[in-house]
């Protein structure tokens, strides 16, 4: 009775389970669809929908090709093996049991097995969409390799594709063969009887033909490997390209092996006809033996007994190929080398001819003054500046000035915890702040040429709102009717910034969320039901996301490697982020392969544990801008000779604008990118010599010195000194140019470590200011080579000299005030002036308080063996050169003062200021060392009142009042905390 009643219950649950499974599948499918549809909306709004559709189209097409190319052969192979099975096969008991298990599932398995392998193959094939599109749209480079005389585009665009196709086809044949063998064995077409293997005729034909196809593919693969020898590492990885043993043993050997593989394939076809396995077995054994003898032993013998006894002479021409290709592939072919016999004499007036350079020496370190920008220009906790600021230049009063710039962005962690605040109210940062790189105030603060809220200064009128930046929130919902309530907090205003001004976004910055369906899509994408439910969202609302400039450029130009340091500029009345993009390859024949992430790592940029970005070709092919207000991305084709860029222009037509579209103002802010320069300096450390013998023996290696100002933990390798932007006149230049430079020293060994300069590399980073035309010398590399017998101290040695100088040490002790302040050393700059090398290092002082910021108090200068430590750079230069350097620095008019607090930068500003040229907001007064308890209680009471007002405002739907109350609450809590810390 119990059993009978249970069966209907189980049957009744079956439809419910099926229904639940269908619903779950639909929900999952809709989540996936939401992600895809959100991508469509994002790309379409930005005007790059074609980029997304091209990627999807290529991926889907390759998936289908891969799926069918795998599934059909596997299915046909299994079907043929099954249909040609023996009718009355003699099976043992074990096979009988296998058949009994498999037979009920046979039909399903015959379709499922090919489908499963097809899915994996399709996914694998679709991942190669870039490789396929490069092959379909390949563009000749006009340069041929020295071994096979083939255009280098063959190696970059064609050879990887051919290898991928042959590898994929080989996988298809192997899986098909496994399917044939398994089916034939299961149904008795292949039987093991003692020591014999009996194969039916039909199975023999199928297996032999499949094996023949496989060996034919292996022959093609081996043949292609000839060409791969010129892009692979040779001589144990010493250099990239085919060496003597490769050219004279490996390449001919691979041609022979490819021919043998073709003969073996023919033997298998013959076996399919005549039914004898002797020929293919002998052929396969012969191929294995030949692979050992011709492919391995013979090249090893040539290397051991012919090359190694006379390696330098025999490998010379191949090292020469490597040198020429490497310098060409990394953009070093046209470098100008200038012998520089640096003097150490400090005679009066020595800098007179370099007066234009000394006037532009930057004393403001962008890696140090971030806290000063924050304390003087942040104004509110919900704003922030980055730790490492950027260097740019602006024309002020008819003169181009180096500046340190930063964008006042939102600080997402300080915008409150409510969803409304985080995504509707606090939506954007405000304005760009710029300070003269060559000046400081009398008390050591930056001299701002653009500052304050609202923004004012020398940069003129521009759109100050920053909706897109490096630290923007993950998403914001902006926009609305002009006549509607303004809920987006714009900037603090009123007396001491006590009030707030609100605004409504009026641009076209993101997809519209003007209907319920789109709101549902983005609610799923960001996993926030508030997007779907919030009644503050209207039919003109837009959702802006993916706001990081580098990320936006990377999405619309997926073929680019993006520079790690986008920088902001005011261009044509807008704040724009300028982003550099690189085209790279690791298939340039004979060019040395390098890990890019390792080459660009320094004290300001960390290196990943496992680099995965090998390159041996790089071009700065694209300059991009991202509008900070509406996020518009504009791509400019910068290197029009680059074959990789030309190829991608065929893939994504109309996405790149020509150089002629670059305005003169934008051109004046473009610069040579630091990551590209770091790659070039690392390669040049070995390839500054063109003599094959020197490369072979590693006799004249150079390296970049470690950053003398960086601190590293025990066991952590020292970080390299980053390159620095400066306006200076190098030997070979007729006037000062905005430049990027670095220095070289001999590499340290187990026995010695010489901290002396061997070279000085600079690149002209000034693109000019002519619309649509970059300066003729832009990107020109100049290498100053110092005599080997000179002992000009390198940055690390100069820093040691500074630290060990008695006078400097005594003054530093006074600045540290018994531990109440700390001394921060700025970037140690090196300049080729006065016939020698001048070192300049700003010295900052800051207190140990949480709200302190660094103040520029001293400048260290060294020339030869002499050291000066003065209040200003101008005074230090005169001190070094016996009272008269013959030139002036940017801080010549500064009269240093010593404030009562010691000039340590205590206190923070928290109110808006008008700013202006050369103006500096006055820091808010610091509280007394011992704040009364009633002050703390008053702050807590204010916080409680603000909290109640915020809750009441939310209840009434008044978002503006709620945001204002939330800000008062945050400030009151912060004030209470600071007061409690002082008790």
Swiss-Prot record:
Residues 902-918 have a biased composition (Gly residues). Coiled coil: none annotated. One of its GO terms (cellular component) is extracellular region. Residues 699-718, 884-936 are annotated as: Disordered. It is found in: Cell membrane. Keywords: Cell membrane, Membrane, Transmembrane, Transmembrane helix. Residues 919-933 have a biased composition (Low complexity). The chain crosses the membrane at residues 16-36, 56-76, 108-128, 161-181, 205-225, 255-275, 281-301. Belongs to the UPF0182 family. This is UPF0182 protein CMM_1204.
